[in-house]
Amino acid sequence: MRIRFAMLGVLLGGLFSIAPAQDRPPIRDNSFLVEEAYNQEPRVVQHISVLALTRRSSDWEYGFTQEWPLGSQRHQLSVTIPILNAADATGVGDIAVNYRYQLAFNDATGNALAPRFSVILPTGDADRGRGTSSLGLQVNLPASLGVHRSLVTHWNVGGTWTASARAPGGGRVATRDIAAAASAIWLLTRQLNLMLEAAWAREEIAIAADTRVAEESAWLSPGLRAAIDFSSGLQIVPGLAFPIGIGPSDGERRVLFYLSFEHGF
């Protein structure tokens, strides 16, 4: 509980940032469950940490992502490293190497489109539920739409194909996952945003040789984020959200902490 109040204090503190906010653009590329369609600006790198805690459980998930522009905003390379804890066992999951192409971008309206292609490396332990022990390919289509100068929406649809997922007891099978997500971001100020995100996924899990089962999940997540800008160009964005399980995930609750550092290089 103390951690939550401390994070809330930092978020509200974003209203009184160190650097003047008038010449700063509004917060854009800092979503939690939904992928926005804004690539990194030239010579600006972003380091993103997301920690999700499961209520009334010791399980947690942490993800670290680093994003770099490749020469310009049109091309972006990133790496996502997940660390998972379940049943008091902690380890690295399957690492994703991502390329994203800025197909369309309008700075004035906030409208953007940026398809992403990812290679998922078999770095996790399948026997402990932290990976598939197989190479995977993933595609996602993030679209961002500025509805109003104070309201931006983000939309995602994508899928993952795993060539030969390994079941915990042995045996392999190809799996296919699909996912969709959407969000509405209210720009309360340039440095403080209220968020409502929704995410749904259908994942196939290998349980034996040539045998898989499908599991669905659905979440509705209210949250907020704030920007703390420094005269050096460094921007720190802390965020807090409370994902609520709906439909197939009814009854599940999580607390999500977000922290981003963005700076030039």
Regions found by a protein language model. Give the residues of each.
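Cleavable N-terminal export/targeting peptides
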Residues: 1-28
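Transmembrane beta-barrel domains of Gram-negative outer membranes and organellar outer membranes
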Residues: 21-265
